[in-house]
Amino acid sequence: FDYGFGPFRWVCTSGRAEDLDTTDRLAAEVLEEMLRTAPDDIRGQLEDNLHWIREAGRNRLVVGSQARILYADCEGRTRIAQAFNRAIADGRISAPVVLGRDHHDVSGTDSPYRETVSIHNGGGVGWGEVVNGGFGMVIDGSEESGRRIREMLFWDVNNGIARRSWARNDGAVEAIRREMARTPGLQVTLPNSADDNVIRNALNETES
């Protein structure tokens, strides 16, 4: 999550396996392109995710809806979604696609009631205590869908990375630096990391 990778989901509303196959191919093409210039700290993630999406179809992971899940970062999600939107517009995908994500994601809603020792009811948070949240966004090949992809996915991922960077997680700090370089309009205040010895000495002085 520190690097922005999380469970990106999509559903082909046509219900056609052929449309899901097309989305798999488009997602793989995006990941292949990203790997050409990817920094070392996320290269392994991209390689694993590329292997996953290439193998997903032959492993028959679909149960019911023609849907897929793929771990992807902000750039990956946005580029994949835009590729889907273009494919819908030109007819390679026959119907709209619904984008979403897991409730437990980079920018997912905190769940103060999550059961961390055992899960008895399958929900993970206890009966009646669910305060998680996700989203579903329909893309239909339109320019308006393209705008929503750019704005919604950008905010959804980078909001979480910023929060994690403020916790001084090295991966998140590097990820948000990279995003600010890629998106000049984004300005996130970076944390100041104090030397452990300075903090230790200050605490010792307070106690004495």
Language-model segment annotations:
Residues 1-208:
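Ligand/cofactor-recognition surfaces for anionic moieties
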